[in-house]
């Protein structure tokens, strides 16, 4: 594979929204599309399903919870393509509303994958993004709702334009710690681990976009978060009002923003419209 080849990559892509995004990119992106999944058998089965539709994604194993797995993927992309053109961070988890798992465990597990692991993917793959690259973090309006349900001093911190990545990581760690000590409500946090994890993803998006502006402005990389809406997936227990194809529309729109585009950047986008933060 020549390092001149363009490549797009989707995490958590063996089913649901990730699978629909991959299918759409296979149709619309001029270059290779890499479908990644934690489970190799499920990932390869998803690739075969798309091949049966006349599409030709590649497969690479990726467990975002495993830093070594992320680094192996980074090395593959560097060797095969000399970098990465499009990254869609879709992998994530959510507990059922009626799940009996104690809230502090739900908080730790949810933030580990949705926030900390997503951040690790960005840490390893952003440095190999090529000029005019596009990064899309799948977030949720649940994150915005969580922000609104935070105490005012916490809201101010999350909205602050000078909040650093280290500050944000400390805040996310504090939420997990506060749930363990059963003081999260007293400390001003909302009662949704998923919401806080997606709040973290959206604020991380704002911070990483700012970093790109400071360090690589000439490369015109655009990095955004988006809410796909309430989609009929396993995660939503098929309760959603949107199809996975509808859920994929905004992520794919952001992934394929034209090379001369300068915005959106560092935004939360739903239905192709920037949301007020």
Curated annotation (Swiss-Prot):
Keyword Transport included in the entry's annotation: no
Keywords (A to Z) from UniProt: Acetylation, Cytoplasm, NADP, Oxidoreductase, Phosphoprotein
GO cellular component: cytosol; nucleoplasm
Entry's Gene Ontology molecular function annotations: 3-beta-hydroxysteroid 3-dehydrogenase (NADP+) activity; carbonyl reductase (NADPH) activity; NADPH binding; NADPH dehydrogenase (quinone) activity
Residues the record lists as binding substrate: 140
Residue positions, PTM N-acetylserine: 2
Subcellular location: Cytoplasm
Known catalytic reactions: a secondary alcohol + NADP(+) = a ketone + NADPH + H(+); a quinone + NADPH + H(+) = a quinol + NADP(+)
GO terms, biological process: cognition; phylloquinone catabolic process
Residues binding NADP(+), per UniProt: 10-34, 38-42, 63-64, 90, 194-198
Residue positions where Phosphoserine is found in the record: 30
UniProt cross-references to Pfam families, sorted A to Z: adh_short
Record-annotated active site: 194 (proton acceptor)
UniProt-listed Enzyme Commission number(s): 1.1.1.184, 1.6.5.10
Family per record: Belongs to the short-chain dehydrogenases/reductases (SDR) family.
Function description: Catalyzes the NADPH-dependent reduction of carbonyl compounds to their corresponding alcohols. Has low NADPH-dependent oxidoreductase activity. Acts on several orthoquinones, as well as on non-quinone compounds, such as isatin or on the anticancer drug oracin. Best substrates for CBR3 is 1,2- naphthoquinone, hence could play a role in protection against cytotoxicity of exogenous quinones. Exerts activity toward ortho-quinones but not paraquinones. No endogenous substrate for CBR3 except isatin has been identified.
The name this protein goes by in its record: Carbonyl reductase [NADPH] 3
Organism ancestry: Eukaryota, Metazoa, Chordata, Craniata, Vertebrata
Annotated gene: Cbr3
